[in-house]
Amino acid sequence: MKTFTFRPKLFSSLKGYSKETFTADLMAGIIVGIVALPLAIAFGIASGVSPEKGIITAIIAGFVISLLGGSKVQIGGPTGAFIVIVYGIIARYGETGLIVATIMAGAILVMLGVFKLGTVIKFIPYPIVVGFTSGIAVTIFTTQIKDLLGLSADSVPADFLPKWQCYFENIGTADPLSVVVGIGSIAIIALWPRISKKIPGSLVAIFAMTLLTYLLRRYAGVTSIETIGDRFQISASLPGGAVPDMSWDVIKGLFPAAVTIAVLGAIESLLSATVADGVTGDKHDSNQELIAQGAANIVTPLFGGIPATGAIARTMTNINNGGKTPVAGLIHAAVLLLILLCLGPLTRHIPMACLAGVLVIVAYNMSEWRTFRALMSNPKADVAVLLVTFLLTVLFDLTVANEVGLVIACLLFMRRVAETTNISVLKDEIDPNADAGISLGAEHLVIPEGVEVYEIDGPFFFGIANKFEEQMVALGNHPQIRIIRMRKVPFIDSTGIHNLTNLCRMSKREGVQIILSGVNPTVHRTLEQARFYDLIGKENICSHIDLALEQARKELAARHPGKR
């Protein structure tokens, strides 16, 4: 296995860097910074923290991801995928617990990158990914109903069903003006692309509805529309760094949540980088990208930030506006920093109903309802994984959905592999020319009397280890020699070795000799390391079936010297 090489895309991108490229990166960075502002505020508030912490996350994480990342155009920051898990951690462990969980997740991501496991993340079953994202979308939508309608409920339950019960019980307290602001924001965001695709609809909606709310408050005496300033104190500065108390009990309690953050971050960042590759024609480095994501999630929470990852929408905005290198991402972070320092206090006038409208659109875009509907016509096993992951995400939390979804997917995968592994009994004759890589030009070989030949087609792992024994029991024969043809066995695991060892010992007690045929180098090495050959003797390991049959005849002759 090759060792990992630390090669951020920024370094290679600066070779031959021109004034024209910088101009393109500058314009793209400014635009992406402006686009990221309302999303950072919305994601911060929806996650249960103050709006400036969402902006701080976009600044610090965006800078680190662009500085160290494995993609030239990836833009990092807070995303909707983390809202549910972050809100749950804060509710249970407080913001200190969130800091610890995020740092742990960052460490996990760094290790995934260092050990070159970036490509493995891409093997997570698609139904699980869709179940996650669709479930998160439903949860985000559900959490925004109170602000969207301006309900005056004192406290809203954390769980899905009680939350909706609370909404229905308090529907009579809805504020008409908040509803107008919320629905108006949704309408602007949905329709604005028909007017202009350069300026994001979310920014237009926030500007328009903030101005409307300000005018209504100042000149009409309206106080029913809640704004950010009514709920949060806005700071126009970066907080100092702080290292949390990471006791062992806290680490143990938060480890499952940290794994969930790491998995979600890895999936979304690599998906975003892959989508970007398809547009730019470039190729990202998955492992380098994971290290950058990990570093960002280690550093950002020390300054009060929340989990961050690569963001598809902001990355595509960067590409569409001419971003060429990671410099655009660095500029985007600088623009957000200037906005925080110079215009931070003005964000207090943004109405909560408007941010709820922004997040409703985010939830809709995340829902992947067309993909969800298409997957419902897939094999039942995939549908089961999809629905279980989706329902657990909505009704419980992402950590449970992550654990159960992956376990179910693994079990179903093992069942499928076990079903594809076939064990057959060869009778009377064998075609020696069927062995891969040889052509003997010989006629079919005759299986001697007293010899059984079994052929295994597929991996010999714990999922099918017992199937071989069941096949022999079903035959009910007691031969003198059993030849196990393993030319189509790509690998064997510990359980397979254990069962094969038990078979050899049982056969030896019954006076039956085991001979292996066609063992490939990988399986040969595994069996040798397990000292399996000491049990049956190296002479009973044959490279091809013709040699195995010859060894069987020698064994029969030795057992019956007077018989020809």
Feature locations, PLM:
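Transmembrane helical cores of multi-pass ion-transport proteins
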Residues: 1-432, 511, 531
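Short, contiguous clusters of charged residues that form electrostatic/catalytic patches at enzyme active sites
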Residues: 28, 186, 190, 466, ...
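Active-site-adjacent beta-strand anchor residues
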Residues: 76, 131, 516-517, 542
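Generic hydrophobic alpha-helical segments
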Residues: 86, 164-167, 468-472, 548, ...
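The feature marks cytosolic C-terminal regulatory regions of anion transporters and related permeases
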Residues: 236, 365-535, 553-564
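Short secondary-structure capping/turn micro-motifs that flank functional sites
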Residues: 334, 523-524, 543
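Short acidic-hydrophobic, aromatic-tinged amphipathic segments that line or gate anion-handling sites
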Residues: 535-551
